[in-house]
Structure formats: structure tokens, C-alpha cells
Design a protein with these regions (language model features):
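Conserved donor-binding/catalytic core segment of Leloir-type glycosyltransferases
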Residues: 26-43, 190-192
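Nucleotide-activated donor-binding/catalytic signature segment of Leloir-type glycosyltransferases, i.e.
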Residues: 68-70, 78-101, 114
Length: 211
């Protein structure tokens, strides 16, 4: 569980003003926050989030800021995230806040408007960040995935976005290569993640409703 009183103290109006000022957010900018490990293999591929937010910016003509708050496991992930943002997000401004940044000792919960976590990884189980977001008073958009299904009520706390995968039985080769030692755990996670797709139409609708 979480300490809800703690989130009450770190997500008030004054904190919001301070955090947005430090990051240089304009009053009219809508801040969409992802918090967690910044790892496209072992957490969540950012492609769907970047594509969805960029489409929402184009459709609504509202200035959006996509904020990734967390830590990179290595330089490969950092480069991949930043290069993807440069190539995909032409209308959306993208910011990265590293975990432990002294300018944001409490994260960026107070400064955000929407929390969005599109996890597509089999190692993700319960998922604490959506609960932390709700404790901070944020509407959430998450994938309809594993433990997220149990913590976010679609249309009540926010929206759950469908994920698509090949039909049952088509993952036999992936499982065999992992259990036989031909592939390591990272290879297995990457292969399954690459076989998982987020419904971008549903994501676009959810974003535009909250924006």
C-alpha cells in the first residue's frame, strides 16, 4: 500500500506551482506524466505513449508536455528514449526528470495533469504508480494489463486501454527458447513485448477526453 497522507502533502497547489515553474511549463500546457523505470524491454515501450500524445496534440491543438520521470538502466535505453522523442514528438514537448533530481525531491506528481502508463511487459505485476497517481489526485490512463486491471476502474478513475497480442498458442517458440536456455530472460521479455500492441485509437480517445 501507500501512505495517502504523504501524497496529500506533496501534491498541493503550492507544490504544483513550484514544480511547473522549475520545469518551465506554461499555464496552458497539459502535462502528461509517466513515472517508473525508463526501460523499453523490461518495463514499457514508450512508442505507444509518444504516438498517442503526439496525435492528441495534433487533433486538439492544445500544447502538451510529455514527462518521463524515472531512471534509465543504461545508456542504450537513454539514447533510445531520447532519439524516439526527437523523431516522433514534433508538436509535443518532451522532458526527462531523473529519479533523485534534487529539483524534484517528491517526483512530479503535483505538477502533472494526467498520469499515463502503457505497460506491455509480462514482468509487470501489481503496478504501484497508478495508485500513487490517484493518491495525488490525477486521472490515469493505463493499459488493461495484469494488476492494473484491479486498481483502475475504466471510466471512473481514468481509462484502461486494450492491448492486443497473437492468439493463444503462437508463443510456444518464445517459451521454448527461454526455458531451454537458448534465450535469456531479457530476450524473452523483449520478444513478448514486441508481440504486444496497444490500441492507439482507444488511447487517443482517452487522452482527448481528459485533455
Amino acid at each position: 500500500g501507500i501512505d495517502t497522507k504523504h501524497f496529500d502533502t506533496i501534491s498541493g497547489d503550492q507544490k504544483r506551482i513550484e514544480q511547473r515553474k522549475i520545469l518551465g511549463l506554461k499555464n496552458e500546457e497539459i502535462a502528461i506524466l509517466f513515472t517508473g523505470r525508463l526501460n523499453y524491454i523490461a518495463k514499457a515501450n514508450p512508442l505507444s505513449l509518444m504516438l498517442g500524445v503526439e496525435k492528441a496534440a495534433k487533433d486538439t491543438k492544445i500544447p502538451l508536455r510529455l514527462i518521463f520521470c524515472g531512471y534509465f538502466n543504461d545508456e542504450i535505453n537513454e539514447l533510445a528514449f531520447k532519439e524516439s522523442a526527437e523523431r516522433i514528438c514534433n508538436l509535443t514537448r518532451v522532458s526527462f526528470i531523473r529519479h533523485g533530481d534534487q529539483k524534484y525531491p517528491d517526483g512530479f506528481w503535483a505538477g502533472a495533469d494526467i498520469f499515463c502508463s502503457l505497460v506491455d511487459n509480462v514482468q509487470e505485476s501489481f503496478g504501484l504508480t497508478p495508485i500513487e497517481a490517484m493518491a495525488s489526485g490525477l486521472p490515469v490512463i493505463v493499459t488493461d494489463w495484469d494488476g492494473y486491471r484491479d486498481t483502475v476502474r475504466d471510466g471512473v478513475d481514468g481509462y484502461t486501454i486494450p492491448t492486443l497480442a497473437p492468439r493463444k498458442g503462437l508463443g510456444t517458440e518464445l517459451a521454448y527458447k527461454y526455458f531451454s536456455g537458448q534465450n535469456n530472460y531479457g530476450d524473452y521479455l523483449a520478444a513478448v513485448q514486441q508481440s504486444t500492441s496497444v490500441d492507439l485509437d482507444a488511447l487517443s480517445i482517452a487522452l482527448k477526453r481528459l485533455i
